[in-house]
Amino acid sequence: MGDTEQIPVGIIGASGYGGVQLVRLLIEHPNVEIVYLGGDSSAGKPYSDIYPHLFHCVNQPVEAIDIDEIASRCQVVFLGLPNGIACDLAPKLLEKGCKVLDLSADYRFRNLETYSTWYKKDRTDQAIAVRSVYGLPELYQQQIKESQLIGCPGCYPTASLLALAPLLKQGLIVPETAIIDAKSGTSGAGRQAKINALLAEADGSLGAYGVAKHRHTPEIEEVCSDLAGHEVTVQFTPHLIPMIRGILATVYATLRDPGLVREDLITIYNAFYRSSPFVKILPNGIYPQTKWACGTNLCYLGIEVDPRTDRVIVMSAIDNLIKGQAGQAVQCLNLMMGWEETLGLPQLCFYP
């Protein structure tokens, strides 16, 4: 593709935090042009009325969702909609020749019975769902390149799976001992008002939620099972912390070989992610901080071994809105189009 040729893309559900992150990234992407911003609840409004800080670079209105119109204008469509809506739109867009990247949970599962159990929506699109590819490029790069439909991962699963993948793929841990303790900023709850995300409620406080029943649990387990080659069950507990963005997931598991030391695992992780430009393995004794990943598409991994308990401890830090959502979707787009994987994606944080 030449330097001046751009593909037309659309975003359905552009008014949420994931949507505005997509807009920001795609505005600066050299190979795309945003030709459609959609959302029925905001239809008719200038996009800059919703996000005034973009008044100088986004002149488009939010348009009503019209599949025929979208397909006639867009080669690629991002779906940033609530769970349970994308599965009604994606089949129609695919039929009309669009590539589709879904940021909801609708196409993350191979088994729709699992989806229906956890998301309380019956599905009849199994034939479409089996064509989707889980959009974690570090694990499924080749499949993403060949797919027309991507189910982009959740933010917690992204951080957790990147921490666990080398251990499961190489059989280094006892899978059923895996525990994921994860903490996220309030932007993960979305832009709509929620009591627990109010400043007066969240500031100066830390608490768990969705204990033993968070919807990201089956998503994590399905990919873990794929990596391990057998069914895997994990213990996952998320927490809300009083900051805007970022996830820190700390993963614990028992090593099969208690003789493994930290240096061994760092070597193993570096080899596993040697072709993954956005995963950074930290040196001995350095542990990640969410600030380092803020505004970037990076995942920082820190590794430790506790010889007293024979457990490995892996800490994973990402920006929940970039690597955990919009940035990862753009990373998948780059692969689908045959472009450089890092194109248009930030790798330097704002610091301090």
Curated annotation (Swiss-Prot):
Where's the active site on this chain?
A: 155
Q: Which Gene3D superfamilies match?
A: Dihydrodipicolinate Reductase, domain 2 (3.30.360.10), NAD(P)-binding Rossmann-like Domain (3.40.50.720)
Q: Which spans are transmembrane here?
A: none
The alphabetical list of record keywords is:
Amino-acid biosynthesis, Arginine biosynthesis, Cytoplasm, NADP, Oxidoreductase
Catalytic activity as recorded in UniProt: N-acetyl-L-glutamate 5-semialdehyde + phosphate + NADP(+) = N-acetyl-L-glutamyl 5-phosphate + NADPH + H(+)
What Enzyme Commission number does this protein have? 1.2.1.38
Pathway listed for it is: Amino-acid biosynthesis; L-arginine biosynthesis; N(2)-acetyl-L-ornithine from L-glutamate: step 3/4
Name the domain of life this protein comes from.
Answer: Bacteria
Indicate the family of this protein: Belongs to the NAGSA dehydrogenase family. Type 1 subfamily.
Xref: NCBIfam families: argC
Function (record text): Catalyzes the NADPH-dependent reduction of N-acetyl-5-glutamyl phosphate to yield N-acetyl-L-glutamate 5-semialdehyde.
According to UniProt, the name of this protein is N-acetyl-gamma-glutamyl-phosphate reductase
Organism listed in the record: Gloeothece citriformis (strain PCC 7424)
